[in-house]
Regions:
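Short conserved micro-motifs at the rims of enzyme active sites and ligand-binding pockets
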Residues: 103, 113-116, 135, 154-156, ...
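OB-fold single-stranded nucleic acid-binding module
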Residues: 28-32, 133, 151-159
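Active-site beta-loop-alpha junctions enriched in small/polar residues
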Residues: 35, 107, 148, 187-191
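Polysaccharide-binding surfaces and accessory modules of carbohydrate-active proteins
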Residues: 1-115, 129-131
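Short acidic, Pro/Gly- and aromatic-enriched capping/linker segments at domain boundaries
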Residues: 116-136
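An acidic-aromatic substrate-binding cleft motif
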Residues: 143, 156-195
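A short, polar/charged loop/turn motif at coil->beta-strand junctions and beta-hairpin connectors
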Residues: 96, 118, 178-180
Length: 195
């Protein structure tokens, strides 16, 4: 667990190591997060999330799901890619002018379930979808990571900007204290022209 008080942010990852001499029992249905957030003011929760990529004009478009008590949104990417059809970043906005940006760090199929428990509470569970394994002696694995960036204010973009600054400060590759600038950045797909 790492805390970043300058950004009201916390992140963690779970690790499993078999320190025994035999294989472990089955490891499955791991919830990397299982948290309920409770707020003072009642009302509906706004879940701001984005489509992932599916090779269309609507790639990465913003989505809004309003969660009332009993509602939930189960999110997962498709095709084993971390952002196919669904992005692993979203913002839970409470009726109390507070919220939390959630980021899931995993290169495969993660899941997140956001559930409105009542007019003041929203629950988050997340992890790796279909994780079902065991460990040989001395073998180790890790789970997806979770990052929660808490924000306050009437404008949810304050949370987005705070999270961007956090990523720049703590997760952007730097050389000599400055973000790395590469001479070229490109990708090729679906018949794009080569440079």
């Amino acid at each position: 667990v790492k805390g970043f008080t300058d950004f009201n942010t916390v992140e963690w990852v779970l690790r499993f190591t078999n320190q025994g001499k035999k294989n472990t029992p089955e490891i499955a249905n791991i919830k990397v997060s299982d948290i309920t957030f409770r707020y003072q003011h009642p009302g509906a929760f706004n879940l701001h999330h984005s489509e992932g990529s599916h090779a269309s004009k609507s790639d990465f478009s913003q989505q809004l799901t309003i969660l009332s008590p009993g509602d939930n949104l189960y999110m997962r990417p498709e095709g084993g890619r971390s952002s196919q059809m669904r992005m692993p970043f979203f913002n839970i906005e409470s009726p109390a002018n507070q919220g939390v940006i959630v980021a899931i760090g995993w290169t495969g199929t993660w899941f997140a379930d956001v559930r409105c428990a009542d007019q003041q509470s929203v629950a988050l569970t997340s992890g790796i979808e279909r994780l079902k394994t065991y460990l040989y002696p001395e073998e180790s694995i890790r789970t997806s990571s979770v990052c929660l960036s808490f924000w306050n204010g009437s404008d949810r973009m304050k949370g987005h900007n705070q999270f961007r600054r956090f990523v720049q400060a703590h997760h952007t590759w730097k050389v000599g204290g400055k973000p790395t600038v590469y001479p070229i950045s490109t990708s090729f797909n679906y018949g794009d022209p080569t440079p």
